[in-house]
Amino acid sequence: MNLFRSVLIMTSIWLTVGCAPGDSTTDLSNQEPAFAPALPTTEVAHAAPDNPLLQKDAFRLLEQATFGPVLKDIEALGVSGPEFWINKQMQTPATFLSDGLAAASSQPWNEYINVWWRHAITAEDQLRQRVAFALSQILVVSADDGLGDEQMGLTNYYDILLRHSFGNFRDLLHDVTLSPIMGEYLSLKGNQKSDPEKNIQPDENYAREVLQLFSIGQVILNDDASPVLDQDGVPLPAYNQTTIENFARVFTGWHFANAEHFVWPENKDYISAMQPWEQYHDKGPKTLLNNVEVAAGLGAQDELNIALDNIFNHPNVGPFISKQLIQRLVTSNPTKEYVRDVAQVFNKNHAGERGSLASTIKAILMHREARFGHIDSPDTFGKLKEPLIRMTQIWRAFEPLSIPSAFNYSWVESELGQAPLNSPSVFNFFRPTFSQPGEIRDRGLVSPEFQIMDEASIIKITNRLLASTIWSHNFKHDSEGKRIAIDITKEMELEPDRKALLDHLDLLLLGGEMSPELRREINQLMDSRDYPLAASQRVVEAIFLIASSPEAALQR
């Protein structure tokens, strides 16, 4: 049994919904891969070939690379192959959040969250959307810290992530640094050089987090993201307090674009990149990472470029960012080989470019471990799905004909413990190193998403899945038109043939891996509703049982 699934069952998911299916794990150890063994490519030595995929393998890729598989993409991957699909996605024009907010008929508080839902469910550039969401959990800002009224600024920040999802990490780091939303969130905006008479010292907030969380981490890393140890077995620090103080001095003298006053500006532009005020910038000499010296007398922009180059070229960046992207997209516990292979692509792709996120994402998704990890390491491969992704997956699977203009699920965090750009701190909703107490921790593994899972959250997400399936399968159940109605037209056509219906739902929601026990539970429930007028009820209840099962809670 997969360890994550075992822990889910042990934490009483099924007790909260009143049923208890058995183990869904299928022994795949002796099965042949769906396509040929991995061959070397110019990007990564352990990439899978670009052959058409079986449906279950197409589903697995789409779970990793989108906000939920849809039938047309599963079928398309059965004709083309993963690399063709990835390339096509990377060429698809971006769907920007700010455009969606501007087009909204009204902009009540937190409307940007509803726009995020719309794009996650319906946008054609699914891979870009999923990568931007992953980046938003690494380069964190949050409306939860006094920015809730700055909807356009928040959407513009998210657009920076969308714009650079397949660009270069150095450019992303530059635009994130000068975002006034980031400037407000981590105190870079209005940061001043030292003035002892006024008891002013440069703020260290952004300097600390750009190093600790956004780029290199706290300790020196090998290419596989394992720590480099000293002779006593202690991890070597990547920087010290003096390093932070020097970077804090670099990050002085920036404020709103066109601000008329540095200390008390009235023109609060949360969209345009911040601009320098040289009189507030510390122009003294500084020492950065790896003892790189910054000469005295340089302006704010020149020093910023030197500092970001210094961070970007640190050897830690490749493994630090690569591992977190793997965790967000594919599996919580990637092997050292997987991380190293991807980090090497980040460090230098086939064109000799460092920091190419397009190459990095392709290396993550095309790596043998991403495609065959469920076979090679069935006990530990995979991850618990984030609550937001469990919701988008159910809505995408039964593609709604439309999303009502009055649709509102902006209060999602109170139910799911998670909302876009709303983490409780700069450390995101969960830490990449969080390890669930018990067997997971005992085995030295991590389980980030388990940090926001407990009995109460299980009940809440189950109730939300109930509302999004049984209660919302057509608009007549919602007189205000605020819910997304799943489209079960296809499923109603299949309903007379029970096996065909369950095979279809199995593919759409579980990638064809439904356990015999879960199938038996669903059949028993449908048998209990075996009267002509209950056909739609049988369908939506079957969907709910699958969507709320431990099998659907895991990405494998």
Each language-model region and where it sits:
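Bacterial N-terminal signal peptides that target proteins for export
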Residues: 1-7
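Hydrophobic helical h-region of N-terminal Sec-dependent signal peptides
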Residues: 9-13
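Amphipathic interfacial helices
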Residues: 112, 122-130
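His/Asp/Glu-rich metal/cofactor-coordinating catalytic motifs and the adjacent surface-exposed loops
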Residues: 27-114, 152-322, 326-556
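Short, flexible active-site-proximal loops enriched in glycine and acidic residues
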Residues: 127-131, 143-152, 198
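C-terminal motif of bacterial Sec signal peptides marking the signal peptidase cleavage site
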Residues: 17-18
